[in-house]
């Protein structure tokens, strides 16, 4: 029993360090694939141009703003390691959530399992070196989920604030993260109602309305992008999208039609 506790202690302290070394290796390169090159090009734009392009052709500018600030903080230039490093740091932050927050909510054993299986997932190694917003979204969505469970156990104003801020950051990361946050809020509401946690209802709706209000300016942009893409897919420039085009657009969210087979097997 004592040896098991010692091993768990070593893993609890060592896994984030191992993750940093493994994932950090992926940022020591100047190679970029197409989407990463797009992110790099956005960083090179002026602030006004960056906002304009994201409003017409992309997700919200939240990730690109963070990336641009971090890139210039690291000195800028033509080397792209700083772009990848930001993803590595957010993945490390995700691991630290597993180390400290999961331990607080559950115990050290669960914390070790959380970090170990996260480290063993190949897709996490991919995203750690990916100059895209997925590592950022993973961090904030995980913080949203953990803080929600923390609130469910014992609510405080501070926890609600953390939950609300994490939710806002998540919905501004990526359109798919927005959908995931919405579904999570529905799940959280169901848990509150089923377990009859009436004292949480007020805080839940205050948080939900706050997130909705803060995101509302970009929600209009997202809806416009949604309609424009469906019109483009239908070959129409004037008519509203049909139900079939809506269903065709949503297939990316809930099917593996455009997902690599290897990743599909991984998620299953």
Please identify what each model-predicted range represents.
Residues 1-9, 264-268:
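Conserved small/polar residues in nucleotide/adenosyl-binding loops
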Residues 12-106, 111-266:
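Membrane-proximal helix-loop-helix interfaces that form the catalytic/acceptor-binding platform
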């Amino acid at each position: 029993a004592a040896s098991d506790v010692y091993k768990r202690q070593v893993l609890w302290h060592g896994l984030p360090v191992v993750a940093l070394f493994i994932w950090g290796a992926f940022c020591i390169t100047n190679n970029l694939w197409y989407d990463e090159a797009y992110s790099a090009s956005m960083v090179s734009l002026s602030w006004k141009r960056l906002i304009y392009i994201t409003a017409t052709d992309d997700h919200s500018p939240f990730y690109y703003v963070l990336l641009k600030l971090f890139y210039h903080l690291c000195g800028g230039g033509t080397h792209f390691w700083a772009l990848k490093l930001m993803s590595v740091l957010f993945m490390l932050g995700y691991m630290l959530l597993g180390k400290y927050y999961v331990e607080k909510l559950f115990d050290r054993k669960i914390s070790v399992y959380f970090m170990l299986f996260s480290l063993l997932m190949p897709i996490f190694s991919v995203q750690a070196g990916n100059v895209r917003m997925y590592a950022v979204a993973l961090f904030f969505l995980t913080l949203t989920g953990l803080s929600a469970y923390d609130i469910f156990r014992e609510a405080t104003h501070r926890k609600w604030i953390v939950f609300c801020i994490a939710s806002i950051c998540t919905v501004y990361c990526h359109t798919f993260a927005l959908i995931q946050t919405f579904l999570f809020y529905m799940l959280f509401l169901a848990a509150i109602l089923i377990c009859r946690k009436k004292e949480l209802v007020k805080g839940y709706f205050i948080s939900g309305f706050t997130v909705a209000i803060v995101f509302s300016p970009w929600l209009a942009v997202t809806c416009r992008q949604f309609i424009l893409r469906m019109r483009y897919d239908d070959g129409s420039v004037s008519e509203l999208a049909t139900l079939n085009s809506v269903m065709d657009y949503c297939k990316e969210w809930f099917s593996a039609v455009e997902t690599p087979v290897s990743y599909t097997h991984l998620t299953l």
